[in-house]
Curated annotation (Swiss-Prot):
Cofactor(s) needed: L-ascorbate; Fe(2+)
Organism this protein belongs to: Arabidopsis thaliana
Gene3D superfamilies recorded: B-lactam Antibiotic, Isopenicillin N Synthase, Chain
Induction: Induced by methyl jasmonate (MeJA). Induced by infection with the bacterial pathogen Pseudomonas syringae pv. maculicola. Induced by wounding. Induced by infection with the fungal pathogen Botrytis cinerea. Induced by infestation with the caterpillar Mamestra brassicae.
Record: residues binding Fe cation: H235, D237, H293
Annotated protein name in UniProt: Jasmonate-induced oxygenase 3
Length: 363
C-alpha cells in the first residue's frame, strides 16, 4: 500500500518549460557531473548508435526445426548477456503501432488544462505525470508521462484513461490487448529457454488472469542543454518484462554495456524493444539479466515512446525458482513481492540497480 497521497512540491510540466523557449534548464533538472551523458556539440543532435539483436519471431512458427532452434538460441543469448533485444514479426500490425503513437502525440499536444484534468498522484501513479519518486528536493528527469493499468481487470479503470483525442480509449484497448498476447508468448519462450515447462514463469507471476499489465507513455520534450540532464535516469526496470515501442526518428535509449559504456540503441522499423525486468532476473536466479538503461534528450526534437510493463501479481512471493537452485548455483536473492519491491522506485525514483542488489542473499 502506498502511503503517499500527494507530491512533495508543486508539479511543473517539462513540456511547458520546453515550450517557454528558456535558454537554460532549471537547476533541479541538472544532474551531478558523474551522471551526465557524454553529449558534446558534435554529437548532441545525432548521437552515435548501435544495433542490438533483431530477432524475427516469425521463424519460430515455420516447419524448419533448425531455424526454430537458432531463433530460440538467439533469444536466450540476448536475455543472458545484454538483457535487451528487438523483435520483428511479433504479431502486431504496423498500422496499430503507428496509430498508437499518433494518438499519444495528439494527447501531448492538447492544451495543458485538458491534460491536467488527468493529473496523477503518487498514490497509484495513474494518469498524467511529470516525476517519479517523492523525495523532496530530488533532481528530476526531463520528461512527462502518462501511466495506466490494463490488467488485471480489478485494477483497470477507464476513468483514469484519457478521453481525448477521440477514439483514444478504443485504440488503447486494441494496443494493450495485443501487448498482452506478445508478453504471454515471450514468457513461454523464456521458460522453455530455461529448460522449464512453458507455463512456469507465467505461473510464478500468478497466472495469466492475475499477472499485471500497465502502459507508461513517455514524452521527452526538446531540451536546450541535453548535456546536463536525462529523460530518465539510469535504472533497471522493477517489473517482469518490458516491451517498448520506441520513437524511430530520435534515437535516445541507452543501455549499459558489459564494459560499463552506454550504448545508444538504433530502433529497427516497426520493431519492439524487449528487456528483462528485475522480477525475471530474480526468478531466473540471475540467468537472465535486467540491465541498466537511461534516456538522453535532444535539443531539436521531442521524443515519444510507449512502454508496456508485464508484471507479477502484487502479493505472490518472488524468489529464485527451485528448479534453478542447486548446490553449485544457490539462490542469489531473498524472497519479496512485487508490491513491496516497486515501492522503492515509487518513493525514491530511478536508482540504478541498487534495490535488486540489496536483495542478494548473503553468501
Amino acid at each position: 500500500m502506498n502511503i503517499f497521497q500527494d507530491w512533495p512540491e508543486p508539479i511543473v510540466r517539462v513540456q511547458s518549460l520546453s515550450e517557454s523557449n528558456l535558454g537554460a534548464i532549471p537547476n533541479r533538472y541538472v544532474k551531478p557531473l558523474s551522471q551526465r551523458p557524454n553529449i558534446t556539440p558534435h554529437n548532441k543532435h545525432n548521437p552515435q548508435t548501435t544495433t542490438i539483436p533483431i530477432i524475427d519471431l516469425g521463424r519460430l512458427y515455420t516447419d524448419d526445426l533448425t531455424l526454430q532452434a537458432k531463433t530460440l538460441d538467439e533469444i536466450s543469448k540476448a536475455c543472458r548477456e545484454l538483457g535487451f533485444f528487438q523483435v520483428v514479426n511479433h504479431g502486431m500490425s504496423p498500422q496499430l503501432m503507428d496509430q498508437a503513437k499518433a494518438t499519444w502525440r495528439e494527447f501531448f499536444n492538447l492544451p495543458m488544462e485538458l491534460k491536467n484534468m488527468h493529473a496523477n498522484s503518487p498514490k497509484t501513479y495513474e494518469g498524467y505525470g511529470s516525476r517519479l519518486g517523492v523525495e523532496k528536493g530530488a533532481i528530476l528527469d526531463w520528461s512527462d508521462y502518462y501511466y495506466l493499468h490494463y490488467q488485471p481487470s480489478s485494477l483497470k479503470d477507464y476513468t483514469k484513461w484519457p478521453s481525448l483525442p477521440l477514439h483514444c480509449r478504443e485504440i488503447l484497448e486494441d494496443y494493450c490487448k495485443e501487448m498482452v498476447k506478445l508478453c504471454e508468448n515471450l514468457m513461454k519462450i523464456l521458460s522453455k529457454n530455461l529448460g522449464l515447462q512453458e507455463d512456469r514463469l507465467q505461473n510464478a507471476f500468478g497466472g495469466k488472469e492475475e499477472s499485471g499489465g500497465c502502459l507508461r507513455v513517455n514524452y521527452y520534450p526538446k531540451c536546450p542543454q541535453p548535456e546536463l540532464t536525462l529523460g530518465i535516469s539510469p535504472h533497471s526496470d522493477p517489473g517482469g518484462l518490458t516491451i517498448l515501442l520506441p520513437d524511430e526518428q530520435v534515437a535516445s535509449l541507452q543501455v549499459r554495456g558489459s564494459d560499463d559504456a552506454w550504448i545508444t540503441v538504433e530502433p529497427a522499423p516497426h520493431a519492439f524493444i524487449v528487456n528483462m525486468g528485475d522480477q525475471i532476473q530474480m526468478l531466473s536466479n540471475s540467468i537472465y539479466k535486467s540491465v541498466e538503461h537511461r534516456v538522453i534528450v535532444n535539443p531539436e526534437n521531442e521524443r515519444l515512446s510507449l512502454a508496456f510493463f508485464y508484471n507479477p501479481k502484487g502479493n505472490v512471493p518472488i524468489e529464485p525458482l527451485k528448479e534453478l537452485v542447486t548446490v553449485d548455483s544457490p539462490a542469489l536473492y531473498s524472497s519479496t513481492t512485487y508490491d513491496r519491491y516497486r515501492q522503492f522506485i515509487r518513493t525514491q525514483g530511478p536508482r540504478s540497480k541498487c534495490h535488486i542488489d540489496e536483495l542478494k542473499s548473503p553468501r
